[in-house]
Regions:
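Acidic-basic catalytic patches of nuclease active cores, encompassing PD-(D/E)XK
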Residues: 1-30
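Hydrophobic "anchor" residues on beta-strands that sit immediately upstream
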Residues: 26, 49-51, 91
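Short acidic/glycine-enriched loop/turn segments that link adjacent beta-strands
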Residues: 34-38
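Conserved catalytic cores of phosphodiester-cleaving nucleases, focusing on short active-site segments
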Residues: 39-60, 75
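Positively charged, solvent-exposed patches that mediate nucleic-acid binding
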Residues: 44-45, 90, 108-111
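Short, low-complexity, polybasic intrinsically disordered segments
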Residues: 99-112
Length: 112
């Protein structure tokens, strides 16, 4: 990943966090890492933990296509690790925030 991609990712996550706060989410953690992968944002709303993947681009393609089964499996393993590490067993869902040209699309409870 180049430096520009890295900073674009941070910018996208910043925008996603602001969006989530306005929607009433409580932000728990950003960039949770494990040996299995990374969760961009962990947030909570209405008693449910939300593990949120953020995709940001200014290019002309469908960014949701960048989340495939391989990436989703890494996210699921990282969620399991998060639950074990923190000793919790709360209900959760996986969400996707796509940001393209400053337009935010929030896809809740995604699955493949």
């Amino acid at each position: 990943m180049g430096l520009k991609s890295y900073f674009d990712g941070i910018l996208g996550e910043d925008k996603a966090c602001e969006f989530l706060k306005k929607q009433g989410f409580k932000l728990i953690k950003r960039n949770f890492h494990s040996q299995f992968g990374e969760i961009d944002i962990i947030a909570k709303k209405d008693g449910i933990l939300h593990f949120i993947e953020v995709k940001y681009t200014q290019k002309d393609y469908e960014i949701s296509e960048r989340l495939d089964n391989k990436k989703l499996n890494k996210i699921l393993k990282t969620i399991d690790f998060y639950h074990l590490k923190n000793g919790i067993s709360e209900d959760f869902q996986i969400d996707l925030i796509c940001i393209k040209n400053d337009k935010i699309q929030f896809c809740e409870n995604i699955s493949f």
